[in-house]
From Swiss-Prot:
It comes from Schizosaccharomyces pombe (strain 972 / ATCC 24843) (Fission yeast). This is Probable U3 small nucleolar RNA-associated protein 7. The gene is utp7. Involved in nucleolar processing of pre-18S ribosomal RNA. It is found in: Nucleus, Nucleolus. Pfam families: BING4CT, WD40. One of its GO terms (biological process) is maturation of SSU-rRNA from tricistronic rRNA transcript (SSU-rRNA, 5.8S rRNA, LSU-rRNA). Its main location: nucleus. Residues 1-20 are annotated as: Disordered. Keywords: Nucleus, Repeat, Ribonucleoprotein, Ribosome biogenesis, rRNA processing, WD repeat. WD repeats lie at residues 99-140, 142-179, 218-260, 263-302. SUPFAM superfamilies: WD40 repeat-like.
Amino acid sequence: MSAQKLNLEDVNASTKKYSRGRKLNPKKIKDKKLRSNIQKIEERIENVESSLAKTEILHEDNPGLLEAEGLERTYKFRQDQLAPNVALETATKSFSLDLDKFGGYSFDYTRDGRMILLGGRKGHISAFDWRTGKLLTELHLRETVRDVKWFHNHQYFAVAQKKYVYVYDNMGTEIHCLKRHIEVNALDFLPYHLLLTSIGNAGYLKYQDVSTGQLVAEHRTGMGASHVLHQNPHNAVEHVGHANGQVTLWSPSSTTPLVKMLTHRGPVRDLAVNRDGRYMVTAGADSLLKVWDLRTYKELHSYYTPTPAQRLTLSDRGLLAVGWGPHATIWKDALRTKQNFPYMNHLLPSSSVVDLHYCPYEDILGIGHAKGFESIIVPGSGEPNYDSYENDPFASRKQRQETEVRQLLEKLRPEMISLNADFIGNVDRAAPSLRKAEAEEEKPPEEKWVPKAKARGKNSALRRYLRKHARNVVDQRRLKVEKSLEIEKKMRAQRVRREQKLPEEREKWGYALSRFVSKK
């Protein structure tokens, strides 16, 4: 066979990896229509498994890692030593920006990793293509900037300024002012739900739908100001760190936290969740770095940092980056097992780390610090094989427009955010009688309305006729009946006055003419 053809043994081995479970035997089913449908479903599942296995074999790009020889340690390698030993294209992606006039820089990459957005503490905003150096926009707001965030593409971004959150386009034009988001410290964006989330000094977690402009939810955490807000990429649940050492998990449909975790004895400085949603890493003011299992909500192990860590971030391949003081330390395989030595270390002389983010699909770690921005090479951090249907770094303008339209059409509702991301499409296997009983318990009791006969005439034939027919329907017969009731009411009142020997009621002529009417 030709070397280009796929090895059947490799395909079979990979097919077992993507198996969807035990296959059904349709021969035992007597119903012909049901048997035919199950056969089609099984064939479809088999084709999917085979396609996934062949796609994995065709992946030519494999992630590379630093490998030490003998007594060498990978954390001793410096960036100036790595640059000559990597590809020229990768070496050009390592650069440094000296921006010491506008304070510490927070930043954000787009989902495809093409654009970067910088936000200086003193009001400097810059958006550009970091590969080519093409500048999109640059602003000087002359106002405090606490955080910046791209939306689902590079057309719009949000800036948390001194009082409100503002939305700009990629040309620097102010589009919206979100006055419901006051004194925000941290921003986050849920791309599949098109929700912008924020939390600030007031301690309110807010969800804003950027496609409709509607404020979806506003939850009071009750734990004071917070500046730690990160999402779980697996289920879109927001993780909020608080000053009392707790981490709370939130969804828009719940006014109370889904989960409360006491993670540290002091304030939570930052946290990060891996792509699978299984592990969470937290950094506290007690100089501890803890790894948590989100399936059991238990601590796995912890690390000690010489000074409290400022920032945490996890790459697509699971590399953990920790920013503490002037250092940025990268740990490999630090989630499942405790490591004795870090993978890499980078020093920022006479500066301090402000923000950390890995660039999607690249072996690049971005570091925002007090004197600017720096991009360093971290071999093995990026995912080499991307899904072009979801994020395509090389998409044309027309493809990006089609992707945006598809994202709007496939937008998920906020009610679909849950701790269990697989609950959609599941079959409720409870007995029908049990489901009916649960539905009746949840249904509010219906109170039957009974007319009260308080006085004479309240339950007459005309009244019973009006109650029997629809109350909101007005026809000629109803008007005639209501007029008859009004005349009957007046006659009854006059009869009562005559029995009590009271003078008949005269017409009310108003305030000006009432003094001329006899009061006898």
